[in-house]
Amino acid sequence: MSKDIKFSSDARTAMMRGIDILADTVKTTLGPKGRNVVLEKSYGSPLITNDGVTIAKEIELEDHFENMGAKLVSEVASKTNDIAGDGTTTATVLTQAIVREGLKNVTAGANPVGIRRGIELAAETAVASIKEMAIPVHDKSAIAQVATVSSRSEKVGEYISDAMERVGSDGVITIEESKGMQTELDVVEGMQFDRGYLSQYMVSNTEKMVAELDNPYILITDKKISNIQEILPLLEQILKTNRPLLIVADDVDGEALPTLVLNKIKGVFNVVAVKAPGFGDRRKAQLEDLAILTGGTVITEELGLDLKDATLEALGQAAKATVDKDHTTIVEGAGSADAISDRVAIIKAQIEKTTSDFDREKLQERLAKLAGGVAVVKVGAATETELKAMKLLIEDALNATRAAVEEGIVSGGGTALVNAIAALDKLSEEGDIQTGINIVRRALEEPVRQIAANAGYEGSVIIDKLRSEEVGTGFNAATGQWVNMIEEGIVDPAKVTRSALQNAASVAGLILTTEAVVANKPEPAAPAMPPMDPSMGMGGMM
């Protein structure tokens, strides 16, 4: 395929057009009075959302050069979403502001490499300032405030804070669609680990690509199962009970896996196999945790146990097990409360004794899975369109809340970014590096300008007043009042704010130092078939 190439200002200008199209679409959603965007779907009803990354992913432009610019900004939104789970619109606004001002200076003759260094230096300094401003989050009310600001809904804030209070900040919180119109919170005890099914033919729900097992037996072993004969006596016992089986093993391969899959497809036997979580000694400990939670025994040679001799008494049990391609969740294990509490006490003692931060983190994860649970937020709405929009809102709120617990909170509404400008005033560089710093200084004001504009206020007026206010005081765009943002509950997670700035500065610097852009030339449309000559007869017809 032949290529189309553009150089220097032509290339950057074409990409800037794409950046503007995407950013102008996304930034209308920013702030408490931001609007929604309607996305056409190839099937089903349109999606109405104000989620920046969802909108960015949908945008495809006809011009290849413009589309590359749009996709680079979409990458900023996606990266911010992956790291912090929220703040994608802020990241998009910051990227547009940095690139726009940077291109003006590059076009005027500035060195793009020097500007990029200045942008990176300013971003590092501002991020350090944001981290210093961060206030730790522990209590339920602060968690509710973060979720409320992210979702623009007090009810959603209550659901998220209740869920985190009941399962802990490290607990598992999932979001499902409710069959009714009311949104509800359901908390059940359970354990989740990062291993999915070994074959997609084991799924029972093809729409969600999930395997669901009700009241399953659970075979837990550290052995590799390659020969079906090893577990055949056990399978025959389970078959008589007409209950499903979840196999958690080192691996299932050889003839064993296709035999299990074939029986599953034929409807003879409902079975799902997953690999055991973790590695080495940590795997042994996690399998033991799972056995205690489900009331089973780890079948291992270390205890003198063999798969051929295993009976139903050695198997764990649970009310439900759900397995997707990446995760396994076991709900309401049949283990005794005393055994579980004893295990929890042992893990807590290990946490106190360990001197390794990594080991401590892994032990805390095990503790959360064993002592915590699974909280399910069941989202209800009047229509499918509203339901999809609500799910996206709650997912963003949940991610923002986790980010807040992890790194603390800062003043919301873009106030923290403007407050971070003071740290940039201490930087003194020369030439194009200083120009890059000034570009970031101006860009840090842009989220506040956009929030104000979306609420019907003049952004420049708000920024002028904000510069003279005390640190932490900001503009509440919902009410039009100047308030202490933290006291008013208008807060953003520090992780979200700094991730948005870091990712925006990174991609903006790359765009500014671009000197050539190579794109595929559009293929010429195939010529239409010429009309048939009416004088020509139809062969074989009278």
Curated annotation (Swiss-Prot):
GO cellular component, one term: cell surface
Organism domain of life: Bacteria
Keywords attached to this entry: ATP-binding, Chaperone, Cytoplasm, Isomerase, Nucleotide-binding
Location within or outside the cell: Cytoplasm
Entry annotated with the keyword Oxidoreductase: no
Chain residues that bind ATP: T29, L30, G31, P32, D86, G87, T88, T89, T90, G413, N476, A477, A478, D492
HAMAP family: CH60
NCBIfam families registered for this protein in UniProt: GroEL, PRK00013.1, PRK12849.1, PRK12850.1, PRK12851.1
Function text: Together with its co-chaperonin GroES, plays an essential role in assisting protein folding. The GroEL-GroES system forms a nano-cage that allows encapsulation of the non-native substrate proteins and provides a physical environment optimized to promote and accelerate protein folding.
Record protein name field: Chaperonin GroEL
Species for this entry: Lactococcus lactis subsp. lactis (strain IL1403)
Organism ancestry: Bacteria, Bacillati, Bacillota, Bacilli, Lactobacillales
Gene from which this protein is expressed: groEL
